[in-house]
A protein has these predicted regions:
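Bacterial N-terminal signal peptides that target proteins for export
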Residues: 1-8
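N-terminal signal peptide c-region/cleavage motif recognized by signal peptidases
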Residues: 17-20
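Patatin-like phospholipase
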Residues: 22-62, 70-397, 411-412
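Acidic/histidine-enriched alpha-helical segments
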Residues: 239-241, 311-328, 582-585, 626-634, ...
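Gram-negative/organellar outer-membrane beta-barrel architecture
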Residues: 373, 378, 390-573, 646-652, ...
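Transmembrane beta-barrel strands of outer-membrane/channel proteins
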Residues: 395, 420-424, 436-438, 454-458, ...
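C-terminal outer-membrane beta-barrel translocator/porin domains of Gram-negative envelope proteins
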Residues: 403-405, 417-427, 561-690, 696, ...
Length: 753
């Protein structure tokens, strides 16, 4: 017989033999139910199945079960699934807030003043809210990472193990079986808990967590052709009478009951050949993701309790090796890659922004290799524009091309958004300040992301502002802005016995008077966003209004000023109030013409340059941070009542003195601030870290440049405890300075100015 025919006969014999072996055993399906963190028990079951050499021919899951099933369907071992799951910070999946380092400089500054980010929308005069407590953006990124962002599948039958996920079609409230597409997106659809995570749009359907309608989809496995079903039930138990103590408990009881009714219907489909595994979890709950190793053990224990039934499905070592080799071969043919050559980029633009603006934020171009890390960074940049409800991407094979599809959905409860402000400070002696306010931002008024931003604040400081801001190109590199505002504040002027502003340690006895500043102001500028966190702007500002000082007969001093300015800003701090990394620089150089007249003086006119610089640089190690703080300012204008006076006083700004207590034409300040993170208090959806620390400060103010010297500056320091909360920063501290000065400070919420 020729060599050709011998080879042909061998191939035919191998195929027939393999088919014969496959035909000798039943097709086994693994069905994994939903149950949050308790889904880790599925991994324990997988471990036992592998130990017993039980082949899985198809895998079906709901909710958390769809996640474990999906990873196993990729051809991963139980140990690999466990390692990936342990490495995931599941709490991050429920935190869609854009981190500070991803925000633009403009967004950071708005957040500092109007820190209560409610995400309330205004559209057509109607108040709207999101359709889910969390957007699912972070969860999508988490699942893409877990699956290595596997390419879109024409059919989940092409995976090493055929796979199905079950979700709820929210329009009909019926089960929907996902059998193709993006694996990560299918998992997310099955896991998006109603009212908690935003539903997933899938080919015209609105899909959410499948647990409510089919938490243990035995019927799906049977429809796929399974001869034997191994089903794992991790569903919640009904509460007993003693636990039904609240309305939420009652609601949870009804939800659990409806889920159990569906599960019982699925159990009724099981035959004598099928195997049901029911882990016991003790007091482990669906949100206990920190107890995943414990859940894995519960799954192993439950699987071992049905060991005799499982043993009947065990293969010989040789046959199991053949099964495993075949699975690994299919995995190699359909595996995720760390980078892809992108032939074409397709933008599915469901927003009012231009396609080019989206492309620019993503920084993706066709005919280039794109890494997964680069694509994820692009998604974060686009989402950080805060115009989008959800931004996703997937890589599709279309013929010989790899097509990157970016799907960007604008928030459907905008395009106007409300945020709020609350701030309170008290020194427990003679001064307390408060402010409440709101901002309204109408976003995307043009296709490049222009905004109409408005602010109102009432309290110690009364503030109104309206501003138009617009990028001048699709990449948002250049911008123009114009604003009009009104401010009225009560400010204390500290005067010496001679009636001069208090400046140095030699000022002698000091008195303070409440002064009223009421001014209209306007500003127009053109700028360059060098980086999202760095910009330069050139413009003109003007202001006009009155100054009055109570107690000394000065009232309605008419004051006006105008002039050009150059402003440079850089902010990469990870936190504005408790920074551990990054760098902050703010600098402005201007030239102002000032007129001042109260009807009794001859009109006082002055002109001159002004400058202002501040810098913060943190260095950190472990839970410690040391911040360098530097500041300087000066003005050459010489109006009788201070308009651009350089001030010191207040916490971390010569602690021990009152705010604005030291005032002059020139200011120098330097300090070191120590921060220790005492507790993280990370609850996933929000954090409430606790800090303690202290500061050492040196600074002074002077009227003449040649008077600036260390001998007339002040030494000060502070000790404090603080936290970052949903209200903003909270500080309680004590400050002390030379001359026996002491002050207690309480600050809650946004700072003033």
């Amino acid at each position: 017989m020729s060599l050709f025919w011998r080879g042909f006969a061998l191939i035919v014999f191998t195929i027939v033999s393999f088919a014969s072996v496959a035909a000798e055993r039943p097709k086994i399906a693994l069905v994994l139910s939903g149950g949050g963190a308790k889904g880790s028990a599925h991994i324990g079951v997988l471990k036992v199945l592998e130990e017993k050499r039980i082949p899985i021919d198809m895998v079906v899951g709901t909710s958390m079960g769809s996640y474990v099933a999906g990873l196993y369907a990729m051809g991963l071992s139980a140990e690999e699934v466990e390692q990936i799951t342990l490495n995931i910070d599941w709490n991050k999946g429920y935190n869609d807030r854009v981190s500070r380092d991803a925000l633009s400089l403009r967004q950071k500054q708005q957040d500092e003043l109007y820190q209560l980010r409610t995400d309330i929308g205004i559209s057509g005069g109607t108040v709207k809210s999101p359709d889910g407590f969390f957007r699912g953006q972070a969860m999508a990124a988490l699942l893409r990472d877990a699956t290595s962002n596997l390419k879109v599948q024409k059919s989940f039958d092409e995976l090493p193990i055929p796979y199905r996920a079950v979700a709820t079609d929210m329009e009909t409230v019926t089960p929907f079986v996902l059998d193709h597409g993006s694996l990560a997106k299918a998992m997310q659809a099955s896991m998006s808990i109603q009212g908690i995570l935003k539903p997933v749009e899938w080919e015209g359907r609105i899909l959410a967590d499948g647990g409510a309608v089919n938490n243990m989809p035995v019927d799906v496995a049977k429809a796929m052709g399974a001869d034997v079903v191994i089903a794992v039930d991790i569903g919640a138990r009904l509460r007993d009478k003693s636990e039904l103590t609240s309305g939420l408990a009652m609601l949870d009881q009804m939800t659990t009951y409806m889920t159990q009714v569906g599960t019982e219907r699925q159990k009724a489909l099981l035959t004598d050949r099928d195997i049901l595994i029911t882990p016991a979890f003790g007091n482990m709950g669906i949100a206990d993701f920190d107890r995943i190793p414990e859940g894995v053990k519960y799954g192993e224990e439950a699987a071992k309790r049905v060991a005799l039934s499982l043993d009947a499905l065990s293969l010989s070592p040789a046959r199991y090796k053949a099964y495993r080799d075949q699975k690994l071969s299919r995995r190699a043919q359909n595996s995720a890659l760390p980078a892809y050559y992108i032939d074409r980029v397709e933008i599915v633009n469901n927003s009012s922004l231009a396609d080019e603006t989206i492309r620019s934020a993503m920084r993706v171009k066709p005919h280039k290799v794109q890494t997964r890390e680069g694509l994820e960074a692009g998604v974060r940049r686009l989402y950080a524009l805060e115009s989008f409800d959800r931004v996703t991407y997937q890589i599709e094979e279309r013929g010989a091309e790899n097509v990157l599809v970016v799907d960007a959905h604008e928030k459907n409860w905008g395009p106007g958004y409300l945020n709020f402000q609350f701030g309170f400070t008290d020194d427990f002696e003679s001064s307390s300040n408060y402010n409440v306010g709101a901002s309204y931002t109408r976003t995307n008024i043009n296709e490049w992301g222009g905004e109409w931003h408005n602010e109102v604040s009432l309290g110690t400081w009364k503030h109104l502002k309206t501003e138009f801001y617009s990028p001048l190109d699709p990449s948002q590199t250049y911008f123009g802005q114009i604003s009009l505002g009104y401010d009225k504040e009560t400010r204390r002027l500290y005067l010496t016995e001679e009636g001069a502003l208090r400046r140095s340690r030699d000022s002698g006895q000091t008195y303070y008077f409440d002064s009223q500043y009421a001014f209209w102001s306007s500003e127009g500028s053109l700028g360059w966003n060098i980086r999202p966190w760095q910009r330069a702007s050139l413009g003109i500002s003007a202001m006009t209004g009155d100054i009055s000082i109570d107690g000394i007969g000065i009232s309605d001093v008419s004051t006006s000023a105008w002039g050009p300015f150059l402003r440079l800003e850089h902010d990469t701090l990870d936190s504005r109030y408790f920074p551990y990394s990054g760098f902050l620089f703010q600098g402005q150089l201007g030239y102002m013409r000032v007129n001042q007249d109260n009807g009794e003086w001859a009109t006082a006119r002055s002109r001159g340059s002004s400058y202002e610089v501040s810098l913060v640089k943190p260095w950190s190690w472990e839970r410690h941070s040391l911040n360098l703080m530097l500041g300087a300012g000066g003005t050459q204008t010489n109006e009788p009542l201070p308009l651009f006076a350089q001030d010191l006083g207040g916490m971390f700004n010569l602690s021990g003195f009152q705010p604005h207590e030291l005032s002059g034409r020139y200011r120098l300040f330097g300090g070191l601030r120590y921060i220790y993170r005492l507790a993280d208090n990370d609850f996933g959806a929000f954090r409430l870290p606790l800090f303690v620390g202290g500061s050492l400060e040196q600074g002074g103010v002077w009227d003449q440049g040649h008077d600036i010297r260390f001998a007339t500056s002040h030494t000060a320091g502070s000790l404090y405890i603080g936290s970052e909360t949903f209200l903003g920063p909270v500080f309680l501290g004590i400050g002390a300075a030379e001359e026996g000065r002491e002050a207690i400070y309480l600050q809650i919420g946004s700072t003033f100015h």
